[in-house]
Amino acid sequence: MSSSDLPPLGFLAVEVNIHRPPGDPYNPRTWPFPLVHELVPGSQEKQIVSKETYDAEFINRFVASGKKLAEKGCVGIITSCGFLAMAQRQLSERIGVPIATSALVQIPSIRAFLGPQKIIGILTYDGERLGDTHLQEVGVDPATVRIRGLPATGHTRKVIQDSVKYDSGEMEREMVDSAVRLVKSIREEGREAGAVVLECTQMPPYAAAIQEQVGVPVYDVYTLGLWFYSGLVRKTPASWIS
């Protein structure tokens, strides 16, 4: 079966017009299976990247768009911002097909892999707005993680908020530096950093560079999507067939 013959994964797109290179979950070249987009109206950065609970109208728009993807034959759905972890339970209850809203949903499994003592670092787009509510929504004890945001006046924020031209070299330097600082801060507590989870969907293209510098497992929406889809659509590897 070729990748084009596989059932599609749905993607809830938001109203943020930015460059999305391979590795970004919006880009079809990121995935080894078909991807179908559905734009959610009223989904700008300031509405999504929030520490406040989403209101009913906001959730309803995501539900409506998610149901459209289900009607198009999508076997599951992912989204374009890790802050949508705060909507995980509501969306999974109402859309009708499995949905993985955020890279953060992997953390309970990562915790099981690592054992109870190691700290999981979260690198996020905005460290001021990502907090306990997002974590608890996906079953994460805030005491077991440490959060670090990208610089408030850095390149990534300027690209998304101010439409500054995307510079991949600058993005990589900023993300690698922030991840190194995150892991260093954990070690300065006298704790061991077990893994880093990249919250932002702009981060996966730079995950390998981050891992090279921090030296621990690195998870993101790409690792989530591959795991998620592999259970939705099982394929028997050719090497298994005699």
Where do the language-model regions lie?
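A short, acidic, amphipathic alpha-helical segment used as a generic capping/interface helix at domain edges
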Residues: 171-192, 205
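Short, well-ordered secondary-structure micro-motifs
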Residues: 22, 112, 132-135, 209, ...
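Gly/Ser/Thr-rich loops at beta-strand to alpha-helix junctions
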Residues: 17, 76-88, 103-106, 125-129, ...
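N-terminal glycine-rich anion-binding loop in soluble enzyme alpha/beta folds
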Residues: 1-59, 126-129, 133-167
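C-terminal functional extensions of proteins
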Residues: 199, 203-205, 219-242
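Metallocofactor- and cofactor-centric catalytic cores in central/energy metabolism, strongly enriched
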Residues: 2-3, 8-14, 33-76, 80, ...
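Conserved mixed alpha/beta catalytic, RNA-binding, or beta-rich assembly cores of soluble enzyme
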Residues: 92, 99-107, 112, 116-126, ...
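Short, acidic/small-residue loops that bind anionic groups at enzyme active sites
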Residues: 90-114, 211-229
